Amino acid sequence: MKTKNHFPGIRQDWFSPLYIGLIKGLKVFFFYLAVLCLFRALYIGILHAFWADGTRLTDAIYAFFRGGKLSMQTAGVLTLPTFLPGFFTGFVSSRMARCVTLILAGVFLTVLSVLFAASFTYYRTFHANFNQMIFVGVQDDRAALFWTMVQQFQLPLRLLGALVLGAVLLFLFKKVYDAKCPIVRIFGENFWHELLWKLPAAPRLGIHLSARVLFLFFVCLIAKLSIFGGGLGWQTAVDWENAGVTRDPFLNEAILDSPQALYRAYRLNGRMRACNGLDFTVEDIRNLAANLSGKAPTSDNLDDYLTRTAAGAKIAKPRHVVLIISESLANWPLLDKYGNIPISSGLRSIIAADDADYCPTFLPNGASTVSAVTGIVTGFADANLYLTTMPESFAAPFPTASAPTMERLGYRSRFFYAGPATWERIGEFTRAQGFSEFVSRGDFGDVPGSVWGAEDEVLYEKFFEHIDPNTPSFDVLLNASNHSPYDIDLDAKGFDKEAVRAALPEKYRKDEELLRELGHYWYADKCLAAFVREVKEKMPDSLIIIVGDHADRYHIEKQPNTYERYGIPFIITGKGVHKGTLTANSAGSQIDIIPTVLDLIAPKGFSYEALGKSLAAGNDRGVNYGFWITRDAIGKSDTDPLVPEGLDGSEGAPIDDGAMQNYINAIRSISWWRPKYGATLDEQILKEKGR
């Protein structure tokens, strides 16, 4: 690359072309960032009519700056294909390098302008930034879609305006790209150059090298910020899944620039397309459903096999049903063998109380939080369907959905989430599945927390702000603190790390990371216990359920046995509950929670649909995506025959292999067919829709 000598009297070296090239790369990056931020500001301002009631200017400013952090990632992605071809071409010809860069910049700026122009109409139509509806539109009648855009949305005029905008931006880009950066003059011209040469050789060389190091450090810093969406690591990164933290749905969408919104649509559509079918025939499903329900396999309506009739309430109907899904709440700290480690005293005290019962043989619905949410919200097991992205989930609540069933019993349903409403589309998903109200971090204001959500104590505090003790309610709370990056100030919360360290086996006492993880379990446990006490004090007529979303995140042992690795607790407490409320041989998974609640409180004759069964009525097995469990054993669900493993890791006692296989297949096949194909069991549907 031929460059002007900006250091007269100093021999040009390898750094000069690198420096000039990187300066141009920074210009490209900051120009893209400025364009994206300008577009966001205009988007927020022009569409201000879509601001939610109560949204303030400060909320919009916060969304603008949070979006700016996210757009650093977008700008970085756009900079690479714009800048790198020209940079390497520059070693052959500076003129050619400039030409290549301007052409590529023109293409990208035009695309950004077209997307910007389209985003207004898109939001007015779908009340969202670009989303999965784009892929639905691709499958639609394209001719009709085209003429609709021409006639209703003035496509030619908008496209012309976008092209003009792209041309203006390219003109400005050329001016910025060709302009001399003031930093160049610092290194070779006028006052600074003359001042530098007046210094002795050694200081001059030191300043020269220091300037290079600082410049390269700045470039690396910008690169890191662009990789992590305005953060210095993934712990503080803003991405499309955690971006929406305001209380305003419109502002949450505005945080995403157009490329990020398109990426979101692509990822969500990919998840939905990954929902492959399971290998069951219609006849298989009919027979399995009949066997599960104890009915004859004579109906082609799958819902007939899911319909239950309550035998009658076992406890007085509570005014409130509160279900806490606690992040990474594993069961192993509650086992007797770990009783000396002081991280679970709160849950242990709840379990020990007379008004509580506890099932220690319980499985999560899947390996992640979203599986727990879908299992509890819809009543279906994890069956290789990404329910939070499937259109069927947003058409109407499934008949097994928890919120509509509880509302039929007179409860108002709410879902409280410590994180953003945009995570896994949880806000839209829970409302689509019948929850009357959704409350998330965006409703909390400026509160302490991590990238995943507000601190647990904040979530519980906000719960009481939304509750009327006199109005019956069904409330689900999903917390987030017991999650990496494990960055809560545990000392400020009162965690006695040294007491925990002393209780650990000698070989683990120096493991600071493990101590930090255990400290977050302690924090979750402490907040849970305090919350349960407060619920019982303020709303004594309440039924409270505590369950982990999943386990398998950390353990004292590096290779724990299967039960300790995957088991989660199921705790039920409140008025009317006593030891023995759950049967002695009870076992289950998250799809069994709502059936258990209904078995306890629903009046005789109450009709509902459910896949799971009640732990208060003898359910003695649970199954999820990869495992099964009973009161005495656990095992993988994909082996034939099934291989039992004792809860202590030893060889398990034999089980009825056929019965367990049928149960596993029934749960999976129904959880696959009903959400994806509906209630009708018809081979033709499978042929038309495919697996």
Per-region residue spans from a language model:
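Transmembrane and membrane-interface helices of multi-pass
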Residues: K2-A274
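Exposed alpha-helical structural elements
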Residues: P17, G21, A144, S258-A261, ...
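Alpha-helix initiation and N-capping motif
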Residues: V35, R142-A143, L256-P259, V282-I285, ...
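General structural signal for secondary-structure boundaries
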Residues: A52-D59, A128-Q132, A144, T148-L155, ...
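Short coil/turn linker and secondary-structure boundary residues
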Residues: T55, V136, D140, D257, ...
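The feature marks either
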Residues: D248, I255-T309, K317, A353
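Solvent-exposed soluble domains appended to multi-pass membrane proteins
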Residues: S293-R691
